[in-house]
């Protein structure tokens, strides 16, 4: 045996000081060419113009008690054939390995090893001219028990860092945005306000990126909370979609937001799923105005711009003549609109149910200001806490599920034939409902992200 080689067994404890890994159990396999280490939430980014990668490592098999956040320079991307014969393109990093009293630099590919028996595989390239393998032995360089390993990680697990969450919006001073930032920071997370207009995309099959004005790359986020104003729907959803392609969790997905923002499409989806809505009509030509009015039971009726929110672009036409004038005026501007039956018995009131993760976490009754028929808070309406019926609760939950929204403000109106769905909002305001109920809605939104990402405070 050469003097500079040492014997290792079929499994050994390794360390990677540069990655902050004091102990990780490795399967030693001279039949495998490359070495790999467990990595999840792998995200490429640039540092001083060079390619780097960030990733999370759970160093103990079958345990998420310890989570390490690692960064390393990328030296390559390679197609690696896994043990099941599948080809996977992996990032390759280099780091110094410590085995017993020996240390040298090895190359590691990053991959999810949750389905494997070991968090690390030590292949023959890493062992070349360094070791001899005795497959009949284990832990030739020393065994460590669970208590010893947890003690090695004690400082890191006690000081576990929070998540990095981006708030994708337009105005940092709005009540809702301030509350979300505040709620995240109170829970120990790093909250980053991202102005939608200052984000831009790099479309690249191997290195997609989201940039922020000034050159900062945003690929290192754990999650984004899209709060997209209607005028920014197209670009905001494109940004959200790009974050999703980087395996960054979106509290509401781009597809769900797109569905909910298209009022006609959303009503069609609700109708398809047998959810009750006010009778509505849609036509392309002013020639069909009279039939459209008759379709919803005649005047009085509601005329809605498809692009409107917060009660804007909604008109009550009290007579047939007024309805014809409003519809034809809107059509002359080449805008899309809906006509909808007017629910007189609601008396200027509606319900807002706030849904998070399939639960109605809060509900309020909104009442229109004197002389106004719209109950929206932004139109001067008032809010009061209300207890909703089981039917109303189920309607709200089914509506959010139909849209695919994890977080939704569902508007319901009480009619003589039962509760009817008015609208599902993917960026519902927090001020009215938090003020009326005293419930920490912003905190519940952060809780949803923590639950989805499996994050728990120590």
Swiss-Prot record:
Its EC number is 6.3.2.-. One of its GO terms (molecular function) is ribosomal S6-glutamic acid ligase activity. Keywords: ATP-binding, Ligase, Magnesium, Manganese, Metal-binding, Nucleotide-binding, Protein biosynthesis. GO terms for biological process: protein modification process; SOS response; translation. Mg(2+) 1 binds at residues 411, 423. Residues 1-162 are annotated as: Unknown. The keyword Ligase applies. It is an enzyme of class 6 (ligase). Mn(2+) 1 binds at residues 411, 423. Residues 163-458 are annotated as: Alpha-L-glutamate ligase. ATP binds at residues 304, 341-342, 350, 374-376. Binds 2 magnesium or manganese ions per subunit. GO terms for cellular component: cytoplasm. Its cofactor is Mg(2+); Mn(2+). Gene3D superfamilies: 3.40.50.20, Acid Proteases, ATP-grasp fold, A domain, ATP-grasp fold, B domain. Residues 267-450 form the ATP-grasp domain. InterPro entries: ATP-grasp, ATP-grasp_RimK-type, ATP_grasp_subdomain_1, Peptidase_aspartic_dom_sf, Put_Zn_protease, RimK, Rimk_N, Rp_bS6_RimK/Lys_biosynth_LsyX. Mn(2+) 2 binds at residues 423, 425. Mg(2+) 2 binds at residues 423, 425. In the C-terminal section; belongs to the RimK family. This is Probable alpha-L-glutamate ligase. It comes from Shewanella halifaxensis (strain HAW-EB4). The gene is rimK.
């Amino acid at each position: 045996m050469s003097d500079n080689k040492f014997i290792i067994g079929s499994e050994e404890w390794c360390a990677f000081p540069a990655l902050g890994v004091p102990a990780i159990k490795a399967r030693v396999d001279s039949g495998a060419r490359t070495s790999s280490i467990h990595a999840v939430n792998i995200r490429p980014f640039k540092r001083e113009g060079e390619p780097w990668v960030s990733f999370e490592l759970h160093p103990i098999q079958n345990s998420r008690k310890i989570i390490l956040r690692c960064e390393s320079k990328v030296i390559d991307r390679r197609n690696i054939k896994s043990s099941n014969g599948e080809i996977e393109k992996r990032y390759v990093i280099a780091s110094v390995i410590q085995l017993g009293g020996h240390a040298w630099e090895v190359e590691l590919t990053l991959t999810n090893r949750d389905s494997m028996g070991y968090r690390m595989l030590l292949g023959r390239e890493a062992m070349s001219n360094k070791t001899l393998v005795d497959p009949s032995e284990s832990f030739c360089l020393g065994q460590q028990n669970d208590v010893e390993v947890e003690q090695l990680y004690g400082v890191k697990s006690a000081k576990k860092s929070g998540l990095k969450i981006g708030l994708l919006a337009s105005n940092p001073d709005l009540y809702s945005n301030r509350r979300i930032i505040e709620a995240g920071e109170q829970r120990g997370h790093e909250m980053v306000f991202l102005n939608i207009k200052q984000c831009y995309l790099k479309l690249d099959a191997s290195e997609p990126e989201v940039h922020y004005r000034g050159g900062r790359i945003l690929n290192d986020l754990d999650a984004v909370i899209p709060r997209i104003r209607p005028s920014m729907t197209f670009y905001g959803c494109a940004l959200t979609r790009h974050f999703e392609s980087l395996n960054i969790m979106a509290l509401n997905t781009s597809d769900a937001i797109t569905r909910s923002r298209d009022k006609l499409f959303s009503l069609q989806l609700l109708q398809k799923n047998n959810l009750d809505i006010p009778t509505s009509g849609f036509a392309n030509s002013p020639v069909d105005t009279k039939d459209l009015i008759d379709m919803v039971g005649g005047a009085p009726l509601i005329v809605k711009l498809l692009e409107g929110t917060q009660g804007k672009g909604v008109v009550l036409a009290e007579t047939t003549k007024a309805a014809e004038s409003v519809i034809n005026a809107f059509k002359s501007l080449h805008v899309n609109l809906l006509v909808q039956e007017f629910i007189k018995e609601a008396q200027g009131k509606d319900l807002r149910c706030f849904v998070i993760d399939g639960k109605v976490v809060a509900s309020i009754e909104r009442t229109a200001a004197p002389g106004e028929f719209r109950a929206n808070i932004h139109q001067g309406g008032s809010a009061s806490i209300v207890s909703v019926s089981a039917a109303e609760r189920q309607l709200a939950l089914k509506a959010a599920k139909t849209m695919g929204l994890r977080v939704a403000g569902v508007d319901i109106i009480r009619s003589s034939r039962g509760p009817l769905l008015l609208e599902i909002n993917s960026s519902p305001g927090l001020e009215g409902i938090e003020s009326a109920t005293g419930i920490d809605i912003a905190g519940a939104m952060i809780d949803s992200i923590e639950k989805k990402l499996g994050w728990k405070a120590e």
